[in-house]
Amino acid sequence: MSEILCQWLNKELKVSRTVSPKSFAKAFSSGYLLGEVLHKFELQDDFSEFLDSRVSSAKLNNFSRLEPTLNLLGVQFDQNVAHGIITEKPGVATKLLYQLYIALQKKKKSGLTGVEMQTMQRLTNLRLQNMKSDTFQERLRHMIPRQTDFNLMRITYRFQEKYKHVKEDLAHLHFEKLERFQKLKEEQRCFDIEKQYLNRRRQNEIMAKIQAAIIQIPKPASNRTLKALEAQKMMKKKKEAEDVADEIKKFEALIKKDLQAKESASKTSLDTAGQTTTDLLNTYSDDEYIKKIQKRLEEDAFAREQREKRRRKLLMDQLIAHEAQEEAYREEQLINRLMRQSQQERRIAVQLMHVRHEKEVLWQNRIFREKQHEERRLKDFQDALDREAALAKQAKIDFEEQFLKEKRFHDQIAVERAQARYEKHYSVCAEILDQIVDLSTKVADYRMLTNNLIPYKLMHDWKELFFNAKPIYEQASVKTLPANPSREQLTELEKRDLLDTNDYEEYKNMVGEWALPEEMVDNLPPSNNCILGHILHRLAEKSLPPRAESTTPELPSFAVKGCLLGKTLSGKTTILRSLQKDFPIQILSIDTLVQEAIQAFHDNEKVSEVLPIQKNDEEDALPVLQEEIKESQDPQHVFSAGPVSDEVLPETEGETMLSANADKTPKAEEVKSSDSFLKLTTRAQLGAKSEQLLKKGKSIPDVLLVDIIVNAINEIPVNQDCILDGFPMTLNQAQLLEEALTGCNRNLTEVERKKAQKSTLAIDPATSKEIPLPSPAFDFVILLDVSDTSSMSRMNDIIAEELSYKTAHEDISQRVAAENQDKDGDQNLRDQIQHRIIGFLDNWPLLEQWFSEPENILIKINAEIDKESLCEKVKEILTTEIAKKKNKVEKKLEEKEAEKKAAASLAELPLPTPPPAPPPEPEKEKEIHQSHVASKTPTAKGKPQSEAPHGKQESLQEGKGKKGETALKRKGSPKGKSSGGKVPVKKSPADSTDTSPVAIVPQPPKPGSEEWVYVNEPVPEEMPLFLVPYWELIENSYINTIKTVLRHLREDQHTVLAYLYEIRTSFQEFLKRPDHKQDFVAQWQADFNSLPDDLWDDEETKAELHQRVNDLRDRLWDICDARKEEAEQERLDIINESWLQDTLGMTMNHFFSLMQAELNRFQDTKRLLQDYYWGMESKIPVEDNKRFTRIPLVQLDSKDNSESQLRIPLVPRISISLETVTPKPKTKSVLKGKMDNSLENVESNFEADEKLVMDTWQQASLAVSHMVAAEIHQRLMEEEKENQPADPKEKSPQMGANKKVKKEPPKKKQEDKKPKGKSPPMAEATPVIVTTEEIAEIKRKNELRVKIKEEHLAALQFEEIATQFRLELIKTKALALLEDLVTKVVDVYKLMEKWLGERYLNEMASTEKLTDVARYHIETSTKIQNELYLSQEDFFINGNIKVFPDPPPSIRPPPVEKEEDGTLTIEQLDSLRDQFLDMAPKGIIGNKAFTDILIDLVTLNLGTNNFPSNWMHLTQPELQELTSLLTVNSEFVDWRKFLLVTSMPWPIPLEEELLETLQKFKAVDKEQLGTITFEQYMQAGLWFTGDEDIKIPENPLEPLPFNRQEHLIEFFFRLFADYEKDPPQLDYTQMLLYFACHPDTVEGVYRALSVAVGTHVFQQVKASIPSAEKTSSTDAGPAEEFPEPEENAAREERKLKDDTEKREQKDEEIPENANNEKMSMETLLKVFKGGSEAQDSNRFASHLKIENIYAEGFIKTFQDLGAKNLEPIEVAVLLKHPFIQDLISNYSDYKFPDIKIILQRSEHVQGSDGERSPSRHTEEKK
């Protein structure tokens, strides 16, 4: 079942993943393949949502989507089935797939789609199914574990398996250990047994030796018995007999030796004698014989000598042996004699020997035991060394691992810090980039609004916002703010305040938009009122509480104070220790100081009685310390060092603890009583507080640490240098330490300096100079700069040295003590190193900035060098700093000495004389009168600063009567020109003083100058408390008013730009509004084109058409005129809007508000000066009932100002309205005049507004001048009252003048006389007793009064000058702004007029162009096919639109194939293929049936056109002959081969081309199925292609030439394809076997074999000659018998000859390894039709018999060649078999039949007879 399903899935459905029976459950466990199967049947529309994953979420998703579809198909599927499939339960997936297969087959048979199946369900069932699906999803979600749980289970299982393996390994190791132990135990037991056995054996040997050593002494009586005597005699006899026998044997042996020697000698003598005789006989015969005899004699003599030597040697050996035997006998006899001793001696000897043996054994045992002990000691020592080495190695490994872990942790922290810095930098850059983009878009927007001319003010404001990181675009509306504004609204408020402040600074400093014009630059007044600034500064000092004077030592100390900072382990302490050896410095370490303070508390260190005052000071300092701790304690600035804990002290806990220390009584265990605690030293008290904090597990706060440091510094002698070690470490500690050492706080100093400068409008130059900051607490700060890696490596080096030190041989107690002591320190160092480095990196930037400002005392040193070099560098720096401090102190001492000397010299000089008295009052009045007379001439407009000095000297003689005249003169003309045209020369105050009659006295200093001494008389205490808030109110109201007005002006600028852009764009849109001209043009064109063709040349018709064109032109011109009038009216409406007047009125009101603010400030300042100087003169200030002067605002017509009229006076605007002058006619001339009048009205209204601004400015200027004149008059009246002896003649004109100036002075005089009326009686009482002291006092008071008056009037006149200058500047800017606004608006109005005129002219021109085109077509009598488009000012001929269609184009007929030379067309070939395919689908048909079909097609050709004309004359014998050529095995015909032959001509392929085509097909057939589709067939192609050089005929009505070869390629696929499959499949190997046919039979077979094998098959040498002959004979046949066509015959002949020559050349050049390819039985049967053709018809038994014969022959051949199991055989071996050779030479299926012979013969016979049917003749003509 699984295999069937797998075949269904893999082959039929072709799923994305190959499924096998083994992996069936796993493949479907995710549900993805199930969704794919349903998707292929178009049932799963949401297959794209499926997830091809094995996670739980993917499975849940897939099965949730599968459940509705499976239930729709009727497959049983629930959560249990889904769970079984997911858990890969065997058989569940197979069962579901089988049910699904059955359901899908049913669905396929029914032909219903998924949508149709869903619609066929009932609604209730559908709802129920949806509920089931939801329930299914919920239950499945609970059943399937989450992926995290699954992963956890998998990890747990994996670790359980690992635990099992580890446990098994441990058990195995334990078992091996037990076995090893048992084996060792057994070996030990065997060794003990062997040892015991050896000991027992040794003991037995010793006992045996002892037993053998015991001599058994026989009894004495036994030697004397008869038997013993006889035995002794017998023994003696026997011995003697044996001796005799031995002697006899020896003697006989000697005799035998002698006899043998004699016999040998006799033999040799005989031989020599015989030889000599023979030699003598032959002596005379030959000399050689003699030589031989002589030689033999010599050899015999030599042999005798050798024998004698041997005999002698033998005798000597015997003699020596005999002597040795005798010697042994003698020794034996001697031993026997020696052994004949007593039994006691022998026993003693045996015992001694035994004792000696025992001693030797004991000695050996002791040596063995000592050796064992030595080995054991060596082994123990070596074990200890190995154990220590292993421990050291393990410690080293642990240390390296810890180092790597810390390094990774540090790298991770560094990466996080770098990432944080990067993110911060990235966010800043992104914010800046966003602001740049906003600025760019804002600029682009306003370039569009302002026509690329952005105002400077706008660009300046945008840049300010950009530089201050404020958003340029509006974030939220701030018009109505809620109670809790949002963040965006707060940002908008900040933006507004920033721009307001910038505008105010520009206004105040007269820069930017408020820069002075060229005509006002020369008359610029002083920027500051020094007198007013001095007054305000004095009042502010009076209002502030008195300061505590700072106590500074008179003589500075030469001691140097510094600190050495750096990271942990940067070498601070080491460097300071080395410095302490060379310099007398005191090193202060916070760790040591804290420990000493705690130790002092434990030691009860008490204050000595010499300083009893210190107790009270400490008691007072405790609450102060408590408050400081509460204020400065911050969790972020808590430092811990050494024993101090790293935890941060919370603020509340710290406060509670410190308050408890200050208020509550300590416990009895810690401090016995409060008195005893207060008797402790400061260090002990600080140590007590530190210990309390540390016991609670808290950190010591910075305040306590700083107190400990300061206490230690105070205990150091004054002239001794001190350096802090690693302190301070945070900015808070540095601030607290500097404040404790210097008594100054930088932040508080800045705040106090800002508070002291109360005023921004008036500054006291004497106090505005910057106060130098106090010198820092340290003279230098040295930073030892090391990297984090160096710090950590140093820590590791220290720990490594300690580890190596531990491994050295030490005393055990010392080692344990060192280990316990260093372990905590190392652990603390290792634990805190990362936090310390991070803390230093976090705090150092702030500390670096602190030590670099205001005086840079920071010195950085690279500490990553050796110790000696670093010490030298620090020594050089310390030496330099000591020298600097010494020079600095000496310089200070020299400065103090110089100051003392200067003070002493000044004290010795006489006091300077007081300044001379002022001139008498009448002279002053004359001067004032003269100067005022000179000012009666009119002044030019725009020069108010020239009038200000005259205001100072104006006398009271020109009173009320001349007010109007002066006002008229000051107003001048509206254009600013004077009436006389001349500017009189005016005198300044300096000039008036120069005219003084006293010329001898030097010129006194002017009030407000640097030489002027201000009046510092005491003022009432209540006055500063009132005047300081009053001035703050003045200043704040002035600044707020200015900011508000400037803000409105800024906002109005945006409004103006937006409005001007809006009216420009709206007017342009109005000009572009649609018109109806195109409708008239289209109607005219339709009428024009609808004219009949016969009327085009008629003159009357043309005249009528011209008239119609004129009518159309007039109508279009009327439309243009109407549009022009509407546009002019629209422009006039825009001009007549009240926007410009309202905007001008609002702008003037804003500038009038600025004037009002300046006027208010002047009035308030005048009142403040008056109150101040009156208070200094001890006068009672008079209440000013007069209301402040108000500048009227412009009344706007569009607003209701009834309410505001009660507060601010309004003046009406005089504007010229166009509606009051002209009515509203609609003619063009009236509109033109109306527009001109509108522009003139705009200009005239602007002149009226300009005059109104000038009048307002003159009114404000006059008000200021009158107030100053009134103040001067009041001062003169007071002086007249006080100077009683003055001349009454001089007073009368002054009184007359006062009446003319104002109406109110009489009332004031009455009020002033009331308080001053009491003074004359006092003056009258004193003249009787007048002393010199009183005269001097009166004189001093008069001088003081004159000085006060001068100072008061100078301050007031300065304010007048500044106010007049400000008012004129406001007037100038107002006129310039109004003029600029009117110019912009008028330019826009003129631009609108320009646009209107240009558009009207363009519309008229386009109408003229249309008229010209129409007249041209009328004259040429042609229709206008393309649309004429006229819209607004555009006219063109639209080539994309035609008003009537074009005539249809001529269509080229399709190509038609013609009959040529009896060749069948493609259509005829397809017709024959269809008929043959219906009768014989397999390609084989019987001979008779084939002949009958051809006869029927030829004879019964009733218009079917199945064959060409020359085929129609074939007779039955000729058709039978044709059949015989195609016959296979004498009974069958292959109709495919017939169609292949009849489709000629086509290029006959060479063998190489066939093989190349085969490789192409195999390359396309990726699955190597042997079949391809039509697309793959066309992609691969054949050895020939279609005709590419087809000529396209020029005549479009002529058809294209027919491409026969292209259609032949498609026909070959249809011919050989199997259409029973869908899509049709082509067996390309079978097709190429057909194309392998050749005129030569043998050649065709070899070509077929090459195609079947896939490579070239070489022919055998024997078969090459006959095949060549056959080829030549067959090649010659067509050339002779085919006279027509000659070209085709010649081409085919050449091709066949070339093929034959190549074959012969290949056969001649057969390589050695040719035909090594193997051929199987199936391939052989395919080549020789061994199993495919018998399937066509089963009724032909003979055919089956033949096929069976081939198969049996092939089997026998394979068996003969050694292939028992029919395995493939090499082609070379196969071709050598006779059966194969015979079959190749006789097989004729691969021979090309030549049917052209029959056709040519038929034509020849028909031509000779001359018989042709008329129908055929006509067909041939066609």
UniProtKB/Swiss-Prot annotation:
It holds the Pfam family CH_2. Residues 1324-1676 are annotated as: Interaction with IFT20. Residues 1-105 form the Calponin-homology (CH) domain. One of its GO terms (biological process) is skeletal system morphogenesis. It comes from the Eukaryota. Residues 227-260, 321-396, 732-758, 871-909, 1686-1712 form a coiled coil. GO terms for cellular component: cilium; cytoplasm; cytosol; extracellular region; Golgi apparatus; manchette; nuclear body; sperm flagellum. Keywords: Cell projection, Cilium, Coiled coil, Cytoplasm, Differentiation, Disease variant, Flagellum, Golgi apparatus, Spermatogenesis. Interacts (via C-terminus) with IFT20. Interacts with DYNC1I2. It is linked to Spermatogenic failure 43: An autosomal recessive infertility disorder characterized by asthenospermia due to multiple morphologic abnormalities of sperm flagella, including short, absent, coiled, and bent flagella. This is Sperm flagellar protein 2. It comes from Homo sapiens.
